[in-house]
Structures are given as structure tokens and as C-alpha cells.
């Protein structure tokens, strides 16, 4: 596609704004799920017949409201989410149309566009009032068709160096695991943004406050390069428990960009590593920031991370330095780290790291880090459990949630049953076709029902076998016979 003309650029800018006052007013209107207006009292019956409802009444006028259609309500919620993430350059209305091809008809209306310092986000929103199966082949194909042209147009206006992420956001649509829609989105590097993702990002906003952008970028641009400059840091290489690790000192600003916290939440099930972390405690985060800035405080204990080695292009490299010692197995050298999002999983120390996010020292201080390289998932999980069992107790809900990962391959039968119960309950809570979908609090997700009563009920029921470490005390065959008799 040829470059945009001056008139085309102006047409796009007319529907975008970075005016703080205007954005604040838009946010107030968009966060309300209802359309509202004031009408004359003698007009009220006409509006009531069209689905409006009365809110308040004055002498001659009435304040009325009407629930926004599902599609527009969802678009407004996504817009507000970006506003709460800190974006202050957004589309002003729903009439933003971009020319993406050479033909006059090659145009597309964009639902939500958010411009950040490093990236531009383009969101296609699809919503329905009631839960229904997804079928978006045409919509995804259309997005694939206009993507490159829209990307070029937005970069021409807002900066060639900006990343552009396309998001396909849905509400109340169910996707079968491994379905064609999911494959199409993945193949075209379009981020699939479901109800679970929306809930997770909003929980991040509440917990992380102004520091949320680091975790959000890690989620959106997982394993994508920040830039082509590599990070080279002096380090000591050692082995412990049969695993390679490095001791190094790194600026918090750097670790915030390449790091990622694996929260125990539905949205992170797509990540191939174990998810186990609790969300940050906002008051604790604020206290750490004040401790660093106002009291010149510091934390001499090491943050523990694990470098993800699943992609060859993002693997770290250690080069020996000259003049090393033969008196120790520890090796002195330089660690080269790819400058990419979400390649360093923070096992312990997330509050310390994020406490620096708003600090004036995030670029000048360095913090001690113990970094594992390609630590197996079960070992990473055990480190987290070992550390936290001797510090703040792991919540009963999180412990039961982790049973599946900890005990699925256990040699002990009773432990495997713990894993099975955990898996069954989580499936009930995650499957959108289940009556319990999103109603069971799993990991760090909040819901009306707790996981523990379900685990207790299953363990006492006759639906699953009973077992000691080495043998079943109630056979599966006997359970089937009992159920058959009851039927």
C-alpha cells in the first residue's frame, strides 16, 4: 500500500485524542454500562416504550438510562481497560476508519486503538449477551487481510519504531481447545483475548497500579524482541542440585522489561511453564517503593529467576573471562541476555522487583539475582513452594490448585488422587459449558465459590477410588458397581 495522503492522515487523527481532559470525560461515560440522558417529563412514556428506564425525576425533566448493546458495552470496557493501563492516546469514538489497501474500498473501521510509548494496540471486539460457541473464520481472515496495511498506516503517523499488536477480543464466546479459530489467530500472531484475559488484566491493574504496564507488555509480546541490542553482564556460573545457575547484578529497569510473573490464573494456562505466583499486594508494593526512595533502602537478598530456554533465538550465552581460578568450580565470565519480553520468570522477589518500577533508582541501582537457565518446570515449582512454605504461608486454595502440577506424575497413588481431584475441579471451573464456569476461585482468580469444599466433597464421595501410597483401598470396579446400583 502507498503512503497515506495528508487528508487520510488528518481523517485518522480526527478520531484520536491525547487530550487528558477529553479522555477523562470519555472514560467516565464509557465505564458506565448504561447510556444516560435527560428528557422532558412529557416525553418519558415514549422512551419507556423503547426500553429506557427512569433513574431520577425533577419537576419538568427526567433522568433515564438504557443498557448499552453487548458489542458497544464490550468495546467501552476494552477502551477503559487501556485507559486504566495508563494509555493516554486513544480513539475518540467508534468511527475510526483506516485505509489499508490501494483500492478505495480497502478500508476498515477499528474498534479500539491505543497508542503507547513503545507500542500500538489495535483491538477487534466481538461480544454476545449469552454464551455461545465461537465461529470467526471470516473475521480472522479479514483481520489478516487488513493487518499489514493498518500497521503501515499507524506507523507512518505515530512512529516507525513502534511495535503494533493486533488483538482479537471476545466476550461470552467459547473456544474448543485447539479449534481452528485459535490456530488461525496463533499463526497470524494475533493475540486471543478472552473473558479470562480481560478478568486477569483488570486484576493486574488493581494489584500493580501504575506498574502494571511491564506485566501487560510481557503478556502481549511474550518472547518478542524489545530491540536487537543484547544485554551483557558480568556473572558467576555455578551448579547446584544438578542445575546450572548464574549470580549477577542487574538494573531493575532491565529486569522489569525482560521479566514476567507466572500468576496462577486461567489466562496463563497457554504458557508452557508452571504457573504458581500470587498477585502482588498493593499496600506492600507501595511500602517497598517508599522504603527505596524515601529511606534509601535496599534488599541485599537475591531475586530468583529462571531463563526460558524454549526458543533458541532467546537463549542466554555465557562466555568465560580470562584469568579465572582453578581453585573453585565457580566460573567467572559474561552473560549475554537477549533483549526480549517475558524470557525471565520471576520465581521469588516479585515485590522487590516491582517496588522499583516507580522508583527514581530503577535505572541506577543494581539488584542481586540468582538466575537458573532452563530449569525444569517441576523444579521451578518446588523452589517456589520451598521458599514460601518457610515464609508467608501458601493459601489453601493455591496449594490445592498446585496439587495437579505437583502430584500428577507422583509414584504415590494417594498423591495422584490429589492431582486428579484438583484437575476435575479446575475443569469444572474453566469449561465455559459448565454451570460452574468462572464460579470457582482457582489460583489467584476470584470467584464466589472456594476450591477447598469441592476437594473435601470429592475425597469423601464414592465417585473416586481411595488409596494409600502403594495400593487402592477401594477399587475403581467397586465404585462403578456402586454407581450402577444407585442408578
Regions found by a protein language model. Name each.
Residues 1-226:
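Intrinsically disordered, low-complexity Ser/Thr/Pro/Gly-rich regulatory segments
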Residues 98, 124-126, 293, 299, ...:
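Glycosyltransferase catalytic domains, chiefly GT-A lineage
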Residues 102, 131-139, 276, 313-322, ...:
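Short, flexible/disordered intra-domain loops and linkers
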Residues 109, 363-487:
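Solvent-exposed functional surfaces
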Residues 136-151, 179-181, 282-288, 420-421, ...:
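Well-ordered, non-membrane alpha-helical segments in soluble/globular domains
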Residues 156-163, 296-299, 362-364:
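Short helix-terminating capping/connector loops at secondary-structure junctions
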Residues 175, 180-340, 371-374:
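N-terminal leader or domain-start segments enriched in small/polar residues
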Residues 300, 305-306, 327-387:
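A short, basic-hydrophobic beta/loop patch
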